[in-house]
Amino acid sequence: MTQDEMKKAAGWAALKYVEKDSIVGVGTGSTVNHFIDALATMKADIEGAVSSSEASTQKMKALGIPVYDLNSVDKLSVYVDGADEINGHMDMIKGGGAALTREKIVAAVAEKFVCIVDNTKQVDILGEFPLPVEVIPMARSYVARQLVKLGGDPVYREGVITDNGNVILDVYNLKILNPKELEDKINAIVGVVTNGLFAKRGADVLLVGTPEGVKTFTA
């Protein structure tokens, strides 16, 4: 199986966690795009979706899936999203696609977080993938200096503005042994909107596309 075929297998496997007549939280990225294709096959059986990015919103609307504003929704039974890295404790680095803040908000509302990845995203220790940090533009230099103090090497992601109008610093050379602690430390820096560590709200179910098929892990 190619990497994309493994992503597709994981995306379609997530359909079984979608409840009839529910509103589904939908993430962002290449693996999620396969899930959206799958979700479209049962759009008559769900009420609709809440999206974590403009890109996913456009794709779902094009496929005829109703998209709701999160503020109009009381609860989400499930949120389906990918990850850039995930460890054995279901802690993740997300935000390679710059949608981390909205992803984190939707994940917080959902009762269950189903993470869909191919097997290249599984790691023992988080941090080889640079950690994205969403930052208010005027605070960029200050936040970068604070991230250096935490042992990271922040790089401004040129030409990228988030859906919220902010910028991204990608932090390299972090060996993240305590993801929850680092998530709090970075979020405490003035000017940080949030960072791509999903440790305080990790995944509940992990679906991994492998050459042998989809493997399921639960927290």
UniProtKB/Swiss-Prot annotation:
Its EC number is 5.3.1.6. GO terms for molecular function: ribose-5-phosphate isomerase activity. It catalyses: aldehydo-D-ribose 5-phosphate = D-ribulose 5-phosphate. Coiled coil: none annotated. The active site is at E103. InterPro entries: NagB/RpiA_transferase-like, Ribose5P_isomerase_typA_subgr, Ribose5P_isomerase_type_A. GO terms for biological process: D-ribose metabolic process; pentose-phosphate shunt, non-oxidative branch. Catalyzes the reversible conversion of ribose-5-phosphate to ribulose 5-phosphate. Belongs to the ribose 5-phosphate isomerase family. This is Ribose-5-phosphate isomerase A. The lineage of its organism: Bacteria, Pseudomonadati, Pseudomonadota, Gammaproteobacteria, Alteromonadales.
